[in-house]
Amino acid sequence: MAPPSTFDGVRDGLVDVSFVTASYTPARHVLPKMPELTGGGATAEINSVAYSRIHWKYFQAANEYKGVKLLGVFTHGPGQIFTVKKAVNTIDDLKGLKVRVGGGISEELGQALGASPFVKPSTESYELLSSGVADGTFFPPESIKAFKLEKVVKYGTIFPGGFYGSAFGVFMNQEKWDKLSKADQDAIMSVSGEKIARMAGQAWDRADHDGMEAMKAAGVTFIAASPQLIKDVQAKAAVVEQKWIKDAATRNVDGAKALAEFRQELKNVAAGK
């Protein structure tokens, strides 16, 4: 099953349970784009827990996961820019850059920055980068190791809090869920919601650490995004952010309010609240 078909596969009963990034289905999953915006928290755990709180408070009622039993949501670690032939030091370095992206906000952000993003599943990244079809990719460090890209990428431009994020849903076929006993349902729900968000975030943070170590061992050069680059990206990202707020309104969600509360929750979670 191709990754973008995961949601339909679970809904239609081809598989019982799975998880997948909402970036693959941006038309269906508009609200999960929120934690993908530039300016997230320092870790996957922080982002995941904050996003989970906002989802269940504001987004669940929009029913974007209609047809499946949603167990939880989470995010991957702070996404960064990885390239093969040249480093990204300034916003001009992004212009015309052929970048593999997962879709959603990462695609919109790439377009806003003047790059040439194209959507392909993460599983095709090695072939795309090694063959020169793609000049780079937007990924968290975890994915570099997972897809053996430390053998291909030469540069990583690192943004505090990430250049972008990616939201995931964990869901089960509704009929399979309905057939479970109440005791089994309760057991599953006891580790779902915010608990699964925190666990998934912690696991991704460990994998991001391993990814960074793999890249260091492979000799990948890391560039800390300069204050000017961060400022330039934020200016372009503001347009993407405003578009998401307008799109959220089509789901009867006050996007500005939800986003402001999400950013406050990022601070709360980072402070241990």
What are these regions (language model features)?
Residues 1-46, 56-273:
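N-terminal secretory/targeting leader peptides
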Residues 50-51:
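Glycine/proline-centered hinge or cleavage motifs at structural transition points of membrane proteins
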